[in-house]
Regions:
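Bacterial Sec-dependent N-terminal signal peptides
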Residues: 1-22
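Residue-level detector of functional hotspots within protein domains
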Residues: 10, 28-30, 94, 99
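Generic alpha-helix detector with strongest preference for long hydrophobic helices that associate
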Residues: 7-8, 27, 72
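Extended acidic/polar, glycine-enriched regions
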Residues: 45, 49-114
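A residue-level detector for conformationally permissive "hinge/kink" positions
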Residues: 5-7, 12, 31, 38, ...
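Non-catalytic, glycine-rich low-complexity segments
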Residues: 21-50, 106-114
Length: 114
């Protein structure tokens, strides 16, 4: 009886955790702690479920920009960066507008990259 309950709980937790996972995948170079070039357009790219809508929200523009993942799962967006500062920025990526499956990049700095 205890083993059956334990098996049921394990199965339930696996199912619930898979519901909250996003299919957004980013290359290693795009991550928390990155530095982006100031006052330019930077390319953010990755992979996701084909046909899904990918949106990016930055704390410096406070608006969403979005695109659709291609048949080969790839997507990309260009984001305009602000002037350099010491402020740590946040970029949130969502799939199909779902906030529960978002990918958050924190501690993003804007400055001179050379």
């Amino acid at each position: 009886m205890i083993l059956r309950k334990l098996s049921l709980l394990t199965l339930l937790s696996v199912c619930l955790s898979s519901l909250s996972q996003t299919s957004i995948r980013l290359p290693d170079i795009i991550s928390s702690g990155m530095v982006l070039q100031q006052q330019t357009e930077v390319k953010i790219w990755g992979k996701a479920t084909p046909g899904s809508r990918i949106s990016i929200h930055t704390d410096w523009t406070r608006k969403d920009i979005s695109t659709e993942a291609d048949a080969d799962s790839t997507w990309f967006l260009r984001v305009t960066t602000p002037k350099a500062s010491w402020h740590q920025h946040v970029i949130a990526l969502r799939e199909n507008g779902n906030a529960t499956t978002q990918v958050v990049l924190s501690n993003v700095l804007i400055g001179e990259v050379w």
